[in-house]
Amino acid sequence: MSRTVDPIDHLYQMVKDGISYGIVHQVAEDEYHSGRTIRIHDQQLINFGLCSYLGIEADERLKQGVIDAVNQFGVQYSVSRAYVSNRLYTELEDLLGQMFDGKHVLVTQNTTLGHLAALPVIIEPNDAVLVDFQVHNSVQTTLSQLRTKKVHIEYIRNDDMAQLEERIVALQEQHRRIWYLCDGIYSMYGNAASITTLESLLNRYEQFHLYIDDAHGMSWSGKHGRGFVLNQIEQHERMIVVVSLSKSFSAGGGAIVFPNFDLYHKVKSCGGPMIFSIPINPPTLGAAVASAKLHLSDELPALQNQLMANIRYFNQMAEAYQLPLVNATENPIRFIGVGLPKLAYAVVSRLQELGFYTNIAAYPAVPMRRSGIRITVTNHHTKEDILALIQAIAQVLPVLLREGGSSMDKLYKTFKMSNPDSLTMPANEEGRSSSAALKLEHHTSIQEIQSKEWNQLLGGRGFEWDFLHCLERTFENQPLPENNWAFHYYIVRDSNGVPVLATFCTKVLLKDDILESGEVSKAVEQLRVDNPYYLTSNYLVMGSLLTEGDHLYLDRQGNWQEALSMFIEELQAEQARCHANTIMLRDFSIHDEELAEWMKQHGYLSRAMPESNVLILQCEDEQDYVSQLSRSARALIRKEVLAFEHMFEVDIVTCDSPTPSEALIEDLHNLYLNVQRRKHDINLFALPQNLWSEMLKHPGWELLVFRIAPEHGGDPEGRPVGFMSCYKGENHYVMSMVGINSQYTESHHLYRQTFYQSIKRAIQLKLPVVHLGIDANKEKQRFGAATHATNVYYQTSDHYAYQVLDNIKANLGSALAVTR
């Protein structure tokens, strides 16, 4: 099964969820557009979803501009601008030039096509491009074209000026120019770019260039409405600003403001959409000309002041009613945090029932647990409208959070906001009160749990008490951070003290490409040469890196959903305490649709895990075992395993054996590293060298150490050529880690010999279930193993690493395409 996740699948599912709540794909039923209200499902709603912030979209002068243009030029002017332009284009660009203090302005069909026209032309193969993680999707759509030119592309955390400067310094010797692509006002949370800091970087680094999309800053800010960005600073000579004529400007199209004529003319002449796309139709141009004239008039400041008064009033009321306003900047986009998408859907739906139209902001536009209500403030709104909306949110939000198992306090923590000291909540506001019938225990050492009970719950799956105690002892006080694991054990009991749920998790530093393809991980490893902790973060992982299988004991006959909710809630609290970016719940059956739906509703994404391999032994001895294999497998084993078996000496090293020498432990570790360094499909840090000696302090562990006699081509000093570390459970045998000297893989079929001898050992111990681990499925199937497909459910608080990985994958794809 492919582990690749199609983002379209996630997006489509989120849209379908929105449709089921009746809050997306809706149709306005108004006979006439007023701006203040909208009719949906025969209900008149106050409209807080428009981006026409100044409220001039129904201005009579703009309407007359449309009428005049239609009367003069018809409804369409269907010819490429590369040949000829309607004269309204010239008039509009002249007026926009006046608005932008004499700069050269190119009108485009919309901002998206403007980006597609400009960026592939102005950015050259030897340039580097730094992309803000949150920059609008319309900007990011151009990156595929830039990759075909082999342009170097990296992502920067949202408005992280320190990271931006660090990358400018790092790239300036290898690249002629370094571009930063960002927004002026970001379209979800409404946060603003650090414009003055960007100006400082432009002044300090001659190779630095800025391309900024100020679509949401146009009209309501700045002299003549030139936008948020150019209201902060003068346009720099190495700075290009893109604005929208479709939002607050209230017409249609986009515009690019260039610092000089040469860039303007080059994009106009060579930009793909400028040559091949149909231009803006005359009615829209007529409205745009009328809007530009209004912007140049004395009326604009009053409109801007009116809107700013509404924005400030919204912020004041949100603070007064103690709402989680995520960003209190003064711009028309307001965002009230809610949490999980299902809660945001519920709040937006309930507000619609109460007479308010708002927008949902949910994954993938924002992180999964940081969904919310996106509200746009316009001049259509009265203070009474704004206050009524604030009061409605204050009424429904705590109630719906409580019903959904959350609370205002948890919400503030999710968004890393301070909870107002005077916050007062309705009775029982503190979220999901623990069910009287259930109680959760959280332990940080297996020694705090009775071994007999634990083994009854999970010991038979390979997670015995003694085994976990061994892991705790091994992965503490290590010199490297990736080898220090924190263990967490969870048990949920019913009123009689009987466990309904039990599991364990580890907090561990992982590589963020752990579930990516080997090709991607190899590319990331090249980037880790100078920084081994690049693209790594703390994870809370169900199970551990040395365990495999179903780690969750869940009594589905009991109150399992409530138990699971309590566990997840405590796990998320631990995530905040230990600063883990991702929760990863792994090894669940792909056929458990009920659990999959539960996970989806609680904001967990899923993807396929590498398939695991399990062998069920039903034989008396190894001869009987081989006889039960397929004909081709029998032939292969006889030819490449049994025919070489006499060449091998296999030592079984246990806790009762003499203590292995330091030299032997070092040899074994080097054999392990031979495999680990080439294994990128599950990209993990190397385990510590003392693991092997610690294993041998535990009666459940044993090492099968392989040597080849010198007369058969082995090491003349008798050094091992391979090993398999195995764990003996009550009824199972786990082949955990393997080490191989690759020199003997082809000549002596060493890899297959390690598998055969491990299975032979399980037969001798009369352990009927053999866990052969993940990957190399075809090879393991030859030995009779069956593959098991499982899912991992994960939730991350910050998607930056995944955006970077997507960029790496896209770069790899472009490189392959160019090669072909």
Region roles according to the model:
Residues 60, 64-68, 72, 94, ...:
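PLP-dependent enzyme catalytic core of the Aspartate aminotransferase-like
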